[in-house]
């Protein structure tokens, strides 16, 4: 199992993407072992120019990332589909940080270890720190390709991931309001995509 340290979207037969410096392409075995085939895969990826990390908790890593990426997608959908617009809306970035924290809390309650640790630590800091970090990051031009471009191209995928997450966690609307709002935005974005498809037929 693994996840790329890059984000982007397709344009016809071309894939446009940017590497994410803060997130190396991460791979791991389901049983947590650092097998020879895993090391061989990591070597191939490194030779292709990707930064690579090995994880002994890949399943936890993927569940953590699922909460993280669906929350960001929901926030982008609420901000006109733009990372730049999102960065300008302090209240939306604040809701994003709260939603991710709530998602991580729900995962922890379900026995999932939040991975990677540096991501867990960032969102464990006083809220002003991750809020400031994400306002700066989302304002960078690359964020439009890495996050917004991916979110717009993967609306169905994002909603499918939310549905899978709901089989793992059960957020309480009273204490996880921001997470529920972000996930509702993901559902709305996927529904609009299908409505457009039907109207074009």
Task: Pin down the residues of each PLM region.
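NAD(P)-dependent Rossmann-like dehydrogenase/reductase catalytic/cofactor-binding core
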Residues: 97, 101-201
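Active-site-proximal catalytic alpha-helix in oxidoreductases
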Residues: 59-87, 91-104
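Short, structured loop/turn "capping" segments at alpha-beta junctions
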Residues: 51-55, 78, 113-115
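Rossmann-fold dinucleotide-binding core
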Residues: 1-65
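Helix-loop-beta segment of a Rossmann-like dinucleotide-binding subdomain
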Residues: 14-29, 77-88, 141-152
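Inter-helical turn/loop segments and adjacent helix faces that build the functional surface
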Residues: 49-53, 82-90, 168-176
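Alpha-helical scaffold segments in soluble metabolic enzymes
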Residues: 40, 44, 66, 73, ...
């Amino acid at each position: 199992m693994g996840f790329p340290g890059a984000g982007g979207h397709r344009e016809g037969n071309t894939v446009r993407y940017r590497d994410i410096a803060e997130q190396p392409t991460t791979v791991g075995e389901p049983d947590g072992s650092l097998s020879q085939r895993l090391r061989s895969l990591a070597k191939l990826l490194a030779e292709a120019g990707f930064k690579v990390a090995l994880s002994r908790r890949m399943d936890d890593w993927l569940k953590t990332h699922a909460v993280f990426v669906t929350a960001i997608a929901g926030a982008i959908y609420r901000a006109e589909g733009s990372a730049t617009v999102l960065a300008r809306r302090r209240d939306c970035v604040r809701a994003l940080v709260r939603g991710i924290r709530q998602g991580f809390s729900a995962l922890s309650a379900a026995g999932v270890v939040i991975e990677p640790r540096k991501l867990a630590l960032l969102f464990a800091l006083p809220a002003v720190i991750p809020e400031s970090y994400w306002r700066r990051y989302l304002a960078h031009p690359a964020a439009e390709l890495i996050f917004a471009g991916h979110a717009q191209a993967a609306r169905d995928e994002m909603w499918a991931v939310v549905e899978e997450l709901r089989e793992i966690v059960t957020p309480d609307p009273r204490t996880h309001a921001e997470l529920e709002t972000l996930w509702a935005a993901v559902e709305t974005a996927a529904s609009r995509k299908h409505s457009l498809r039907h109207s074009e037929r």
